[in-house]
A protein has these predicted regions:
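Flexible, acidic/Gly-rich N-terminal and inter-domain linker regions that tether
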Residues: 1-77
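Short microdomains enriched in Cys/His and/or Lys/Arg
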Residues: 57, 107-120
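N-terminal pre-triad scaffold of radical SAM enzymes
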Residues: 67-95, 113, 128
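Alpha-helix capping and helix-loop boundary segments enriched in small/acidic/polar residues
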Residues: 78, 82, 103-107, 165-169
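Conserved strand-turn element in the central/C-terminal portion of the radical SAM core barrel
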Residues: 90, 97-101, 193-201
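Iron-sulfur (Fe-S) cluster-binding segments and ferredoxin-like electron-carrier domains
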Residues: 94-111
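Conserved SAM/AdoMet-binding glycine-rich loop
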Residues: 118-222
Length: 222
């Protein structure tokens, strides 16, 4: 990368492109007479698999080695709940494609509610969730209408330079989730600390139901 920045950029492009595919290829690069092998990522998790990983008996507290010290990063996320995995934004500065991919896997509403109830029981919880989000705040429940098209897609982003016509941008499931969480006894207010993709909100879909849900989500957010 020091000798040839264009070659390095080309190399990274190949890595990013394969990371964003539904069915990636194995990458092999010769280095000093040997071969570096990058195996394809696992397929996106199912909702059941994601629920199982979040339903494990986590303590929600820092490692004992910190011995009660204040950890700023922990303070920021200790009353937050992750609702999905993956992001189809494709931002050039972001590495989510390398470790989560662009295909969204959502937790079930039941799994999320179960975790929120555990947060409510935390001794220093005052009723305010700091974040009900994910890699991006408002991609929950979104996917390609035609999965076969997604399987062949090589685009790094589903929304740039324009929103893919195959993308279902309906925010209805997310609105329903927010309201279910806010209705729980012990919750005074839930905040959205993750980044909101406003291009999804401003998008004019051919589906009027999705347009109405985007307007409703914007009001809910404000």
């Amino acid at each position: 990368c020091l000798r040839n920045k264009k070659a390095q950029a080309s190399n990274v492009r190949h890595l990013e492109e394969e990371s964003n595919k539904m069915h990636a290829q194995r990458l092999i690069q010769e280095v000093d007479g040997k071969c570096a092998v990058v195996n394809p990522p696992y397929p996106p998790m199912t909702t059941e698999e994601l629920d199982a990983s979040f339903d494990l008996p986590y303590t929600r507290v820092p490692h004992p080695k910190y011995k009660g010290k204040r950890i700023p990063a922990y303070e920021m996320i200790k009353f937050s709940v992750n609702i999905h995995r993956g992001c189809f934004g494709g931002c050039a500065f972001c590495t989510i494609s390398a470790h989560q991919g662009k295909f969204i896997t959502c937790r079930s509403k039941e799994s999320i509610i179960k975790e929120v109830k555990k947060v409510i029981e935390m001794p220093d919880f005052k009723g305010y969730l700091s974040d009900l989000g994910g890699p991006s705040a408002n991609m929950y429940g979104m996917h390609g209408r035609n999965p076969k098209a997604c399987e062949k897609c090589k685009r790094p982003s589903c929304i740039h330079p324009q929103i893919c016509p195959n993308l279902d941008t309906d925010h209805s499931k997310l609105i329903d989730l927010y309201r279910a969480v806010d209705a729980l006894p012990g919750i005074k207010k839930s905040f959205i600390g993750s980044g909101v993709r406003y291009d999804l909100l401003l998008h004019k879909s051919k589906d009027e139901k999705a347009n109405q849900a985007a307007r409703e989500y914007t009001r809910e957010l404000i």
